[in-house]
A protein has these predicted regions:
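N-terminal periplasmic/intermembrane-space "pro-region" immediately following the signal or transit peptide
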Residues: 26-123, 235, 291, 455, ...
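A short secondary-structure junction signal
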Residues: 238-239, 249-254, 291-294, 349
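Bacterial N-terminal signal peptides
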Residues: 11-21
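Outer-membrane beta-barrel pore domains
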Residues: 127, 170, 195, 275-468
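Short helix-to-loop capping/linker segments positioned immediately adjacent to catalytic or ligand/cofactor-binding
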Residues: 249-253, 267, 305-306, 324-326
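N-terminal secretory signal peptides that target proteins for export/translocation
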Residues: 1-8
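Outer membrane beta-barrel
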Residues: 81-248, 255-274, 283, 320, ...
Length: 468
């Protein structure tokens, strides 16, 4: 019986302890409930304050006119890419770019009497330039979207001789349908490949020899260009140009109307993710009236020759680019070539103090170049170029008919000019380029000109991507 009484005693003791703690736990529950009510009230007040502030902001937004969206800056490139069509007031402010260029040159032969043997002199864009330090050519470019329909570009060339000339000044449409675009004003012709590229974007200090011989440098048009880009995966571009034809090999005609034009086609594509290519064919037709040049006859006497007739030029161009997986920051290679052929038919005048003669003239002349540029390290490149010209078949009526000897046309004597160039450049940034170039120039009759040049280029301001 003793164990039973002991069990009752323990149960009673437990009940007494529990009853003693109930008031304490009830007090704790009340305290927790009070804290929860306080937190709920505090959060409710904060929510009401935020809702009130939100209502005020919504009222302000509803009564304030929306701000104009910030425009994208218009794209700029010496060979400009299709520009942005961003709106807003700032879109009417032109993007400004300045290219500062200069060099120092050591030339074996006198550059003042530089002439490419076998070809009619083509103007000031021929030759290696001056000896010693030369400020060279700098460029000032302004570009902008005029409105949603037109893009404008002005590029002025500032020479070291304190002269300013307009390289390009044109407007281009932005809103024509079906892949069409129309350009009007002064612009570099789209024929070939390198003709459209501004001098600061060349891979060498100077242009290929064939461009100097046949165009006197870069061929520009004062006129219009209509271009069509096909809506296909394969890049297909067709273009037609016309203008006043005043640049060599044409001249400004002494009458109203146009002077010839050009037809262009370019195609291109990618091969995998590392190789891309582009190829093209171009045709240029112009007329020349009294396209004059100075010469020396066989006795050293001064002669003024002048060509009048039709000039037609065909251009075939191709370029292949390689960059590992499309990333050209580390390594890349570019292989580029062009072939040009010019046919001219008309009359050639021969004028001296004692004679004024003229007879038929016909010439079939050509030239080509091949160059490769390899970027072997980030910002470091090496390149080599080979130039070749053929003065071809030249038929001079005054010579064929026995009126004058061939020596009377000294500059037109048969020749095969050549040049080999090598360059090495360093690009500390995308805005700076320092280039060292050495060339063996055999473009003259019998003089080899060894040319060593150090060039600098600096870009200031807006600077867009160059053409492919």
């Amino acid at each position: 019986m003793f164990p039973l009484h002991r069990s009752h005693a323990l149960r009673g003791f437990a009940i007494i302890v529990l009853l003693a703690t109930l008031p304490a736990r009830a007090s704790e529950v009340s305290e927790l409930r009070a804290q929860l009510d306080a937190l709920r009230s505090d959060y409710q007040a904060k929510i009401q304050a935020l809702e009130s502030r939100l209502a005020q902001l919504e009222t302000q937004v509803a009564t304030t006119p929306p701000a104009a969206a910030a425009p994208e800056p218009p794209a700029f490139a010496p060979a400009p890419a299709p520009p942005s069509s961003g709106g807003g007031a700032n879109a009417f402010n032109p993007a400004v770019s300045v290219i500062l260029g200069g060099r120092v040159a050591q030339l074996d032969a006198d550059p003042t009497d530089y002439r490419i043997a076998g070809f009619m002199p083509a103007g000031d864009g021929v030759g290696p330039g001056s000896r010693g330090f030369d400020l060279g050519e700098s460029e000032l470019t302004l570009t902008a979207n005029v409105d949603p329909y037109f893009f404008a570009n002005l590029t002025a060339s500032l020479s070291g001789e304190n002269t300013v000339s307009v390289e390009e000044a044109y407007v281009r449409t932005l809103a024509l349908p079906s892949g069409l675009s129309l350009k009007g004003g002064r612009f570099f012709s789209g024929l070939g490949y390198v003709n459209e590229v501004h001098s600061h974007a060349w891979d060498f200090v100077d242009q290929p020899l064939v461009y100097q011989a046949l165009f006197g440098g870069q061929l520009a048009q004062d006129g219009a260009q209509l271009k069509w880009l096909a809506p296909t995966d394969l890049f297909i571009e067709l273009a037609a140009e016309t203008g006043n034809g005043q640049r060599f090999p044409g001249t400004r005609l002494a009458r109203n109307g146009l002077n010839g034009g050009a037809l262009l086609v370019h195609v291109g594509n990618d091969i995998g993710d590392s190789v891309s290519w582009r190829a093209g064919l171009s045709w240029l037709s112009q007329r020349a009236e009294n396209r004059s040049f100075a010469d020396l006859d066989g006795t050293g006497g001064a002669v003024a020759d002048a060509f009048t007739g039709r000039s037609r030029t065909w251009v075939a161009d191709a370029i292949l680019k390689w960059a590992p997986h499309g990333n050209g920051n580390l390594r890349s290679f570019k292989l580029q070539a062009e072939y040009l052929r010019r046919n001219e038919d008309g009359q050639l005048a021969f004028v001296t103090a004692q004679q004024n003669l003229a007879d038929s003239y016909s010439a079939r002349q050509s030239g080509w170049y091949l160059q490769g540029v390899y970027q072997f390290l980030p910002r470091w490149r090496f390149g080599a170029r080979y130039d070749s010209l053929d003065s071809g078949d030249v038929a001079i009526g005054l010579v064929q008919h026995g009126v004058l000897p061939l020596t009377a046309f000294g500059v037109l004597a048969p020749a095969a000019p050549r040049r080999v160039s090598a360059m090495f450049d360093w690009n500390p940034s995308e805005f700076t380029r320092l280039r060292l170039q050495y060339a063996w120039d055999d473009a003259r009759m019998s003089v080899r000109d060894r040319q060593l040049m150090l060039q600098y280029l600096y870009a200031i301001g807006a600077h867009g991507a160059h053409k492919f």
